[in-house]
UniProtKB/Swiss-Prot annotation:
<protein>
    <recommendedName>
        <fullName>Centromere protein M</fullName>
    </recommendedName>
</protein>
<keyword id="KW-0158">Chromosome</keyword>
<dbReference type="GO" id="GO:0005829">
    <property type="term" value="C:cytosol"/>
</dbReference>
<dbReference type="GO" id="GO:0005654">
    <property type="term" value="C:nucleoplasm"/>
</dbReference>
<dbReference type="GO" id="GO:0005634">
    <property type="term" value="C:nucleus"/>
</dbReference>
<keyword id="KW-0539">Nucleus</keyword>
<dbReference type="GO" id="GO:0007059">
    <property type="term" value="P:chromosome segregation"/>
</dbReference>
<comment type="subunit">
    <text>Component of the CENPA-NAC complex, at least composed of CENPA, CENPC, CENPH, CENPM, CENPN, CENPT and CENPU. The CENPA-NAC complex interacts with the CENPA-CAD complex, composed of CENPI, CENPK, CENPL, CENPO, CENPP, CENPQ, CENPR and CENPS.</text>
</comment>
<dbReference type="InterPro" id="IPR020987">
    <property type="entry name" value="Centromere_Cenp-M"/>
</dbReference>
<keyword id="KW-0963">Cytoplasm</keyword>
<dbReference type="GO" id="GO:0000939">
    <property type="term" value="C:inner kinetochore"/>
</dbReference>
<keyword id="KW-0137">Centromere</keyword>
<dbReference type="Pfam" id="PF11111">
    <property type="entry name" value="CENP-M"/>
</dbReference>
<comment type="function">
    <text>Component of the CENPA-NAC (nucleosome-associated) complex, a complex that plays a central role in assembly of kinetochore proteins, mitotic progression and chromosome segregation. The CENPA-NAC complex recruits the CENPA-CAD (nucleosome distal) complex and may be involved in incorporation of newly synthesized CENPA into centromeres.</text>
</comment>
<dbReference type="InterPro" id="IPR027417">
    <property type="entry name" value="P-loop_NTPase"/>
</dbReference>
<keyword id="KW-0995">Kinetochore</keyword>
């Protein structure tokens, strides 16, 4: 078990692999199932993990995109994400990591303020997406978006790289933290 690096493994031919990290097993599995239903030109592989580090395995494929799923109803979810981030190499944050906050629709039940997750994403210079994964329609839409982002991060979209995508996502964000 060690730091997860983007170039530890060779890429698979026409394969795109996403790692979903989060404490909500059922929601992660539902999101993974929705992603696998999506139309994808490449072979899509979805791996789930409660936390990092991953056990070192010779058979584990190269990870093209890591999505940290933070449930805003659980402080443990945020703590788990913060601890897992320590096991990710800095070069992964060049467009191959994003945060997904779920549960924002019922703010009265949230134990984590949205601003906390915004600061976390800003600290790691990574995009932050919001989606209520408990709603099937929202989950299906998020699955589509994640599959598209994964294809870009895996290098399967000509003319667009993970860094290009990162700069596009950052420029479409709202005001910076300093402006708030």
């Amino acid at each position: 078990m060690s730091v997860l690096r983007p170039l530890d493994k060779l890429p698979g031919l026409n394969t795109a692999t996403i790692l979903l990290v989060g404490t909500e097993d059922a929601l992660l599995q539902q999101l993974a199932d929705s992603m696998l239903k999506e139309d994808c030109a490449s072979e899509l592989k979805v791996h789930l993990a409660k936390s990092l580090p991953l056990p070192s395995s010779v058979n584990r494929p190269r990870i093209d995109l890591i999505v940290f799923v933070v449930n805003l109803h659980s402080k443990y979810s945020l703590q788990n994400t913060e601890e897992s981030l320590r096991h990710v190499d800095a070069s992964f944050f060049l467009g191959k990591v994003c945060f997904l906050a779920t549960g924002a629709g019922r703010e009265s039940h949230c134990s984590i303020h949205r601003h906390t997750v915004v600061k976390l994403a800003h600290t790691y210079q990574s995009p932050l997406l919001y989606c209520d994964l408990e709603v099937e329609g929202f989950r299906a839409t998020m699955a589509q978006r994640l599959v598209r982002v994964l294809q870009i991060c895996a290098g399967h979209v000509p003319g667009v790289s993970a860094l290009n995508l990162l700069s596009l996502l950052r420029s479409s964000e709202g005001p910076s933290l300093e402006d708030l």
